[in-house]
Regions:
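Outer-membrane beta-barrel translocator/receptor signature
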Residues: 53-55, 68-70, 81-153, 161-168, ...
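Short acidic/polar hinge/loop motifs at secondary-structure boundaries
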Residues: 33, 49-76, 97
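Residues on the lipid-exposed face of transmembrane beta-strands in outer-membrane beta-barrel proteins
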Residues: 125-131, 170-174, 221-225, 268-274
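Outer-membrane beta-barrel channels and translocator barrels
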Residues: 5, 99, 131-134, 175-179, ...
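Extracytoplasmic beta-strand/coil segments of soluble accessory domains associated
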Residues: 9-53, 70-71
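Transmembrane beta-barrel architecture of outer-membrane proteins
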Residues: 3, 29, 59, 87-89, ...
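Transmembrane beta-barrel strands of outer-membrane/channel proteins
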Residues: 106-112, 140-146, 184-188, 236-242, ...
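Flexible loop and strand-edge segments within Gram-negative outer membrane beta-barrel domains
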Residues: 147-167, 173-175, 179-234, 240-264
């Protein structure tokens, strides 16, 4: 919110030691560099769970809406490799918003790209309800974003691709006792992006086109319990992310450049801590 970001990629740009790059003017592929290392050396977690697959990671930095994020934790250096094999450069842990009080918020931003008539149009909604006893609560979010294609040098080819995305999600908790709780989280993201030339025509009629249509579902369920003195803590969790992608990557009006990809990532585990 302080950075007026609409997605995770924009918010990470303000983190010290982290660099976000746009590496393709057609599809808008972004990667995050930690300590100068390429993006595939960084592990992205959602609520500390490694469900952010390699397929999702290609465009995922722009697909996670800012209004579902409570905070972002960045761990730099090889020590973060404890979180996964990809975490050589560092780890980015996205913590989703948890309900803390009854509230509702509606926001809309309109940003001009390079002072042109291309705009990034973003609408966000957040609401949360917490019971009077504080034993249960739920927060919901929604976002609708449209970004026009931006052609900086007027050659007919985009430097920034079109994005149309919609996302909804929730996070809830229920305290089963004084020192135990169940937490559930779910989100759904639809995103369409298109870059190249002749954006108003089918991609196989353009000179060059990259078009990607994503449908992403993800969620998690966790149980936490601790002793009264917090010296003994136990956590069990299960999480998933399912991604379906339809794409076109081609040039010279190639009719055979369409493709589909499906990816399912499931993670589960338990942790016991004694101090």
């Amino acid at each position: 919110e302080r950075a007026n970001a609409s997605c995770l990629a924009q918010g990470l740009s303000f983190q010290p030691g982290v660099r976000v790059e746009d590496d393709c003017q057609n599809c808008g592929f972004t990667q995050v560099r930690i300590n100068g290392l390429d993006g595939h050396y960084s592990q992205i977690l959602v609520d500390s769970h490694p469900v952010f697959s390699s397929l999702t990671g290609v465009y995922g930095l722009e697909q996670i809406p800012a209004n579902m994020i409570e905070r972002v934790e960045v761990l730099r250096g090889g020590g973060s490799a404890l979180y996964g094999s990809s975490a050589i450069g560092g780890t980015i842990n996205v913590i989703t918003k948890e309900p803390s009080r009854n509230s509702a918020q509606l926001a809309h931003t309109l940003t001009s790209l390079g002072g042109s008539n291309s705009y990034d149009n973003n609408t966000m909604l957040n609401a949360s309800i917490v019971s009077e006893s504080g034993r249960a609560g739920i927060s919901v979010f929604g976002q609708s974003r449209h970004r026009s294609g931006y052609d900086h040098d007027g050659d007919g080819f985009t430097e920034v691709p079109v994005i149309n995305s919609q996302s909804v999600g929730m996070r809830s908790f229920f305290r089963t006792g004084a020192y135990s709780r169940i937490t559930a989280q779910y989100h759904h993201i639809n995103e369409f992006r298109r870059g190249g030339d002749m954006l108003d025509r089918p991609p196989h009629e353009a000179l060059i086109a990259e078009q990607i249509d994503h449908s992403i579902d993800g969620g998690s369920l966790s149980f936490d319990i601790s002793s009264p003195d917090r010296r003994n803590r136990f956590n069990a969790y299960a999480s998933f992310q399912n991604t379906a992608r339809k794409s076109y990557y081609g040039s010279k009006q190639d009719p055979d450049a369409y493709g589909t990809t499906h990816d399912l990532t499931v993670a589960a585990g338990m942790q016991y801590i004694h101090e």
